[in-house]
Amino acid sequence: MTESTFPNYPRLVLSKGREKSLLRRHPWVFSGAVSRLEGKANPGETIDIVDHQGKWLARGAWSPASQIRARVWTFDKTEPVDIAFFTRRLRQAQHWRDWLAKKDGLDSYRLIAGESDGLPGVTIDRFGHFLVLQLLSAGAEYQRAALISALQTCYPDCAIYDRSDVAVRKKEGMALAQGPVTGELPPALLPIEEHGMKLLVDIQGGHKTGYYLDQRDSRLATRRYVENQRVLNCFSYTGGFAVSALMGGCRQVVSVDTSQDALDIARQNVELNQLDLSKAEFVRDDVFKLLRAYRERGEKFDVIIMDPPKFVENKSQLMGACRGYKDINMLAIQLLNPGGILLTFSCSGLMTSDLFQKIIADAAIDAGRDVQFIEQFRQAADHPVIATYPEGLYLKGFACRVM
């Protein structure tokens, strides 16, 4: 397709001086940068983005209900947004995942990581021959049919299941969506393999797309710290860290979560790997309350894993989230024996690594303990971060030695 045969896209005109982020290839246009929309565009429809003088900058998706008014599909003026576009993006992403899966022996991984794979608002996780889809923006939803067609071209033997039941869709003016798209339904619990572990994944009812693939490498790293140690696994979900700790030779692992269903799957995961169930304890409780109760009882641990859910959704919640992270890490530090290890994480995108490190330092001061930072973590390599979109680095963590 030549430029002259392109559709006459509506044009989003930016205010003077507001094109700088696009010139640096950042994929978002915020509402404050917009001067006007020339022409009519439905939510999610493709638009051209131009500066105040009409100079072409990018091609993206219009989202009038969101503070992010447009998300960029391409910075190439000659590239149309069609089925072939999505097919190219999928194949580019698969090339890296194929190498990674072969190298690490994976049958499950993140296939598309949104903006970092050139598909803003699109998340696709692969579990065996199931592709689990999340469409989180108006543009992604508008292109649903094209994206599914591209998936069927690239992965004709895979079933597709939609888990777009995510609250963020409401910010884009969209209803939640969930259910089979093509192929058979996923089983209630699908076994996958990760670094020598067998793990059961609940695609239909589990968190996110069913499992936290981003913590794969952190779960493996846990093994070096746990031999003959007593481990506390907070916010344990379905027990990936617990299974890894048992494979690393821990003396005991206590897994804590508020969901009994998740704890039941965690127990099954221990049994599935033929590990010693007598070394695993499963506690349904609120982590904050339980840590305080442990402190009052004088309980001590050698390793504590702290992997909480996202505490902050927007900037207005950041200060409160900082207090929450500090309190929970302070409690964990107080429960550790001298020389104990705290493995602590934040999956909040607004929480920078530097800020998180400062929070842990403040927590150590409040706990009256010295802490050494000995290892740093981030999301696994199938969750890449494109250089022009630093927000893609959402998961950060530290291994800390508590003196």
Swiss-Prot record:
GO cellular component: cytoplasm
Pfam families named among the record's database cross-references: Methyltrans_SAM, PUA_3
Entry-linked InterPro entries: PUA, PUA-like_sf, PUA_sf, RLMI, RlmI-like_PUA, SAM-dep_methyl-trfase, SAM-dependent_MTases_sf
UniProt keyword terms in alphabetical order: Cytoplasm, Methyltransferase, RNA-binding, rRNA processing, S-adenosyl-L-methionine, Transferase
Keyword Cell wall biogenesis/degradation carried by entry: no
EC id: 2.1.1.191
Entry's localization field: Cytoplasm
Catalyzed reaction equations: cytidine(1962) in 23S rRNA + S-adenosyl-L-methionine = 5-methylcytidine(1962) in 23S rRNA + S-adenosyl-L-homocysteine + H(+)
CDD domains: AdoMet_MTases (cd02440), PUA_RlmI (cd21153), RlmI_M_like (cd11572)
Domain PUA: 9-88
Presence of the UniProt keyword Cytoplasm in the record: yes
Described function: Specifically methylates the cytosine at position 1962 (m5C1962) of 23S rRNA.
Protein family according to the UniProt entry: Belongs to the methyltransferase superfamily. RlmI family.
Protein name: Ribosomal RNA large subunit methyltransferase I
Gene (name only): rlmI
